[in-house]
Amino acid sequence: LQYSIDTRLKVENSASVEVDAKTAKMIGCDPGDAWHRIESVRYLDEKSPICWSDVYVRPEHQNIADRIGEDTTPVFMVIEKEFGVVAEEVTMDLFAGSIEESKAWVMGVKPGSPTLIIVRKYKDKTGRVFEVSVSEHPAGRFTFSIDLLRSSNSD
């Protein structure tokens, strides 16, 4: 449930924010809560953007923003290495959306184009969310496959 090691995040902006009501609902917190938002684009290579990602981390982890994109290490693993916070549970939601104008030009699509939005919430052993990533994939740039295997009882 993570991206290939062949992809890389490029940080576009990083800032401490108080989340608005819409963002709070999406990431599962209260409006006005303090988070550090890392706005980034995930690339397959230097020319092919796969998705726009807004990564929200707790304020005490904000200094990891400088480490994002140095290599292909996922953000939650950077937090684990730097702070010892281990992801014990990850919740993932997928839903359809449409891309905002501010992100469309970076992704090379028209504003309002359809997207697949994936929200991942990373929780520590106490159940506290320490990272939320909101990834927005323009149509045709992400495939999610699940294989289900039915076993028969031969009793």
Walk through the language-model features, giving the residues of each.
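Short linear motifs at protein or domain termini
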Residues: 1-4
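C-terminal all-alpha effector/ligand-binding and dimerization domain
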Residues: 6-155
